[in-house]
Structures are given as structure tokens and as C-alpha cells.
Amino acid sequence: EIGRLLAHLPVLAAPTRDTLTIEHEGVTHTYHGLGDSQAARIWEIQALTGRRASEICMLDRHPLTRIDFGGGPASGPADPDAFVARLRYQQTKVDGVDPTILVTQAVVTIIEEQQAWFTEHRPDAADGPYLFVQPRGNARGLNPRTYRSYAD
């Protein structure tokens, strides 16, 4: 259930030394953080866009194209649900379709957070092609994060 998943995303992202208390549907639980902010961002983008896990895991390092509203940033939509960019993803199931979707500022913000995380935590992989990288055995960031690496 998507509500439960979203309620527990902070546990996935929190450092392993942290303890979090999550209340969902009237039930309170305490968890230790799992320390995987990349996986949390993958899940969140997946929930907000409806794209497949593999499509999110294989996003290019710079997958966004901002929508030009013709009058500069101030003339863009103030509605948080308005589309502000196109997200280019890896289409692996269907041939002959445009592999882009319109996304809101919430998705743009998550992608910008991941780009900042990448710069801070994986500067050795700065030239790698993927936004989400395999966490182990991938010093140069040439391999995308696999579904298996965050599903377990």
C-alpha cells in the first residue's frame, strides 16, 4: 500500500544510528534508520510518477528539461501540482514512445537532492552516466542502481 510506503520513507533514508518513531493509521512503531537515502528517493519518485522501478533506477545523471513559461522563472506556475519539467527516463518495455513525462516541482526537488547527494558522497563517480548508482563495487559510477539492490 502506497500510504504505508510513504509513511515509512524516513526510516529508509535515516542514518543507521538514528531511531525514528512512525505513526501510521493510528499505530506507532519505532525503527532504526536503514541509511539508504538513494533508495528512499527512488521510491518517492516512483510513487509520484508511476514509473517502473527500473526506469527510475536507470535515470540519466541530468534527466530534467525545464518547461519554459515565456517570462522567466517568476511567470511559472504557483500551483504545486503544476507541471514544471519533463523527466527523461529509460524506456525498456515499449518501442516507439517518447520516454519523457511531465513532472511537478516535488519530483524536480527530489532529483536535485539526489544530484547534490551524488556530488557530496560520490565525487569519484562524477563522470558516471546515472543518477542512481549501484552502491557497492561501482567506484566510477558506471552501473545504475538495480531494482534488486533496493528491494531487499
Description of each model-found segment:
Residues 1-152:
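Extended accessory and catalytic-adjacent subdomains in large enzymes
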